[in-house]
Amino acid sequence: MIRKAASLGLAFALLAGPMFANEGAVPKGVPHLDHVFVIMMENHAYAQIVGNPNAPFANHYAKSANAANNYFAIAHPSLTNYLEVVGGSNFGVQTDNSPSWHDTTCLTNLATGTVATDVPASPDVCPIWGTGTDAPTPAIDYTNEVSLPSIPAVSNIDGVQSIPAAANTVGKTIGDQLAGVGKSWKSYQENLPPTGPDGVNNADGFYSNVTLFTTPLPAETQSLINLYAVKHNPFMYFRSVQEGLNPANSFSNVAGFEGAHGLFEDLASGNVPEFSFIAPNQCNDQHGRGNAGPQCDFDPQTVGTQVGLNPALIYLGDLALRNLVKAIHASPVWKDGHSAIVVLWDENDYSATPNTNQVLTIVDINYGVSGVQSSQPYSHFSLLKTIEGGFGLPCLNHACDANVKVMSDLFAGEGHRQDHGNGQYGE
């Protein structure tokens, strides 16, 4: 998400009647998957990364592995897309607001049928659970992410498609599904504070919004750099994780990158879960911050092209991505079985229509085809559906929609595969 938006009229009235969501059949057309690593990058459209000289690794990787070249994020802001990747729905949430932690008295947006938005402002997000109706996704967003008079509207999906609200949306994620069948998952969050994720909305890796500071504040805390952001850790918004009644689906599933049980230690030991959700910090994911130095400054302009980007921010994220992929390739789990790395950007740069919400998505598998350049129409729902199929899980919410395709061509097991086991991409 970028800066708060000015309020304009809603376009939801143009949408069709409600759809119906929940859990469906196990998707077919995907080989069995032992491990999946999803790496989430931020806020850059397809055309801003592809061909960008400041993203040499991502561009080489997209050619050496497999690439979805007709892949679309769903909506805005960031949290909405993160929820759609792991849960197949926005769950009535179209804001980056923090969770209403451990709130057992509030009513979910699913239950009330109301939509949590930035404009008009909404309270913190009630813990998601139960069933109900999610929010529709119009083709054009005239409200949440309109920040300048020169940007009267931004596109959702391709600027043409819309998604009606879905009744019987179930408030759960792929994490709930995995834990329910005895499989493991973890959300690896760079710069998560040592106190863990409970109640933490923002952190710099040590200090956070729940730190009990002394008075006066120590100098190093005068301007907290929000490197970790809960809006990039979607599992925290669900009651099942906040309550933690199942230890396999709780705060213990969240770890940082460094230290005991962190990402790099787990990769080195080979002790990784079936599903790893990996979120670099807000400098390394190319989101940017306003107080973390020039290399992490926000892009000066958002026009849908490479004009106006912060080249240092793009390069910083590209280096971070390279290091993550190398670490996964070096892990014992990459040597055996069927594993996949998926790199994607959550949404575009909020440039005005007619720029669309197209983003680059890279799929790297250790068991099958490589070099595939797919032009099939895919979305965040396609990705969830594909991963669920690979794990033998039923599709969830909008991942079950009839027009959502499984990414079979990018996950195919047959055909020649180059040996990328030593992490040679971009070296």
Show the residue positions of the predicted features.
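Bacterial N-terminal signal peptides
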Residues: 9-18
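N-terminal pro-sequences and low-complexity stem/linker regions of secreted or lumenal proteins
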Residues: 21-427
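Bacterial N-terminal signal peptides that target proteins for export
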Residues: 1-9
